[in-house]
């Protein structure tokens, strides 16, 4: 959180954006049955990042939270389409039947998913 009286905050209020790169470390992508997200796809998310001056985004797709093995593939595909903009969190689900396999798959996709969410 930035101090609302700081030089940086004043610059933002006067110019509508900051002169430094913005890196978002918590985002979710794809549709969710119970929550409305206006920017669900990787294409929409990157377009929104461009509009708002966000350089890079670390995310976890909702599909990966419910179905880690298939959802992880979506996350990695999105990152590989936008390698300079997106990074994903690798999901190891608490109800996973084969955590060792999920960890191995996470290591195989570490270029796309450098973070872990348990």
PLM segments and residue spans:
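An N-terminally biased module of ancient metal coordination in phosphate/nucleic-acid-related enzymes
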Residues: 1-73, 104
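Active-site gating/metal-coordination segments in enzymes
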Residues: 55-56, 66-118
């Amino acid at each position: 959180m930035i101090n609302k009286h700081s030089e940086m905050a004043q610059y933002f209020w006067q110019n509508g954006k900051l002169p430094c790169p913005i890196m978002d470390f918590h985002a979710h992508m794809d549709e969710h049955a119970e929550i409305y997200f206006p920017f669900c796809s990787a294409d929409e998310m990157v377009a929104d990042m461009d509009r708002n001056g966000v350089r890079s985004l670390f995310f976890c797709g909702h599909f990966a939270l419910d179905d880690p093995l298939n959802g992880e593939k979506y996350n990695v595909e999105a990152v590989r389409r936008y390698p300079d903009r997106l990074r994903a969190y690798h999901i190891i689900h608490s109800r996973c039947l084969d955590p060792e396999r999920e960890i191995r798959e996470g290591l195989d996709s570490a270029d796309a998913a450098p973070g872990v969410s348990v």
